[in-house]
From Swiss-Prot:
Similarity section: Belongs to the IPP transferase family.
Protein name stated in the entry: tRNA dimethylallyltransferase
An annotated Gene Ontology molecular function: tRNA dimethylallyltransferase activity
InterPro entries: Dimethylallyltransferase, IPT, P-loop_NTPase
Annotated binding of substrate, by residue: 19-24
Species in which this protein is naturally found: Shigella boydii serotype 18 (strain CDC 3083-94 / BS512)
Pfam families xref list: IPPT (PF01715)
Amino acid sequence: MSDISKASLPKAIFLMGPTASGKTALAIELRKILPVELISVDSALIYKGMDIGTAKPNAEELLAVPHRLLDIRDPSQAYSAADFRRDALAEMADITAAGRIPLLVGGTMLYFKALLEGLSPLPSADPEVRARIEQQAAEQGWESLHRQLQEVDPVAAARIHPNDPQRLSRALEVFFISGKTLTELTQTSGDALPYQVHQFAIAPASRELLHQRIEQRFHQMLASGFEAEVRALFARGDLHTDLPSIRCVGYRQMWSYLEGEISYDEMVYRGVCATRQLAKRQITWLRGWEGVHWLDSEKPEQARDEVLQVVGAIAG
């Protein structure tokens, strides 16, 4: 697309970053200054009743600065990148029609990628194929299926852990249904995002600072009633660890504690470690991201001013 045709597109802002990097706080500050409306880009914040462990903005913050695409699914329901793209495009169109600018804030990089580049035409899930895969896993173990994936799609196998049955079974399912690998199909993108996007990433300057923030926030969540929140989900009886909601960082570890699999101290340790691993994956995504302007979360006023400097001209 030429620069001239790109300039004629409506404007949008991406504010990306790892967990515990201060994205939401900066977005709320920007909302006070710029003609923007916030859209959440977070695969955990979509779930109702999952507030403390996801660091969801509180009621007071949401009253002052509404966020779209929060609390749109029950934890028993799935929500795909395709679902997100559809919903986000509808919200962006609504915001643009009102003469304002969509500000998309979050850390689910797969959602940002799907929105920006479009989605490859993957086949829909097939219950029969999935059942066959799960039967094979029950008989031979997931390690055996991972070796099978390595033979047909080594690129996907290198990316998917043998202990991740959800992604492993999906990669095999795609191959069995279409005869093409997940890697082949995902190299074919769909429609690009019809917006002129200004992209920002916020993170602390050092990994140690981010690790400190993550540990501090996990303990704050525990002090705020995270265990009681997960106990309420646990007591429902219809939720389990195969669901994306309960596999969210922190929830999975607390669930193991409630099931008596691990001690409280082990839950805290694993929860902090899993959150750090998530942050590492998010930063790895962002380092390979083109056209992103990095902001230092330890200098919030400077970060805000840098965004205003870049975005101010388009918001005037």
